[in-house]
């Protein structure tokens, strides 16, 4: 693998992180946000739940695109898939209609179904009209194959992990110092 210009990798050093922190200069016409993170966009909240134990290294990330009810206040969106094999859920409708109507969940490849079920239940609880006076909901779940790092066959991501990530995002949002405190409170509840 070729190294990023201006950065020499030493033995055991990990160059993952933000591209510019690794010496990679990306040229574009837009200015980066203050922290160069998704949470620089006003209203976006993000939280994750990590599951680790021996060979288990996986988790769930929840992205709330705004503070309101996403099903009732849909957002214009698009998708571009790179190196994808069609295992994410909700992308086809997103491309067809050009909007998202749920929070976005990211998890491992074999946990997409579990995450979609949890996200659908979350949306049904918030919107009693889904499937009654409106259409159904399009849960948006993306994935990454973490099988090299994780016992992916163990199907360790459960509905409660998705629920916890959503709750953490709602309660802490972009305040990552507060995120750890909220996570501890939820675990002890």
For the regions a protein language model found, what residue spans apply to each?
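N-terminal cationic leader/targeting segments used for protein routing and processing
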Residues: 8-10
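Cationic, low-complexity basic patches in intrinsically disordered or flexible, solvent-exposed regions
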Residues: 3
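Alpha/propeptide regions of enzymes that mature by internal proteolysis
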Residues: 12-189
């Amino acid at each position: 693998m070729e190294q990023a210009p201006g950065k020499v990798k030493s033995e055991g050093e990990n160059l993952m992180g933000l591209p510019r922190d690794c010496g990679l200069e990306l040229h574009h016409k837009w200015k980066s946000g203050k922290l160069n993170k998704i949470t620089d966009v006003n209203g976006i909240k993000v939280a994750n739940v990590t599951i680790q134990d021996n060979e288990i290294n996986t988790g769930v990330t929840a992205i709330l695109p705004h503070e309101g009810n996403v099903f009732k206040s849909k957002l214009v969106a698009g998708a571009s898939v790179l190196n994808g094999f069609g295992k994410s859920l909700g992308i086809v409708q997103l491309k067809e209609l050009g909007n998202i109507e749920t929070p976005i969940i990211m998890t491992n490849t074999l946990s997409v179904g579990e995450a979609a079920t949890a996200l659908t239940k979350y949306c049904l609880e918030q919107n009693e009209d889904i499937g009654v006076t409106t259409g159904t909901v399009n849960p948006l779940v993306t994935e990454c194959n973490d099988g090299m790092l994780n016992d992916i066959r163990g199907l360790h991501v459960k509905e409660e992990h998705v629920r916890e990530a959503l709750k953490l995002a709602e309660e802490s949002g972009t305040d990552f110092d507060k995120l750890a405190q909220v996570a501890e409170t939820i675990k002890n509840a």
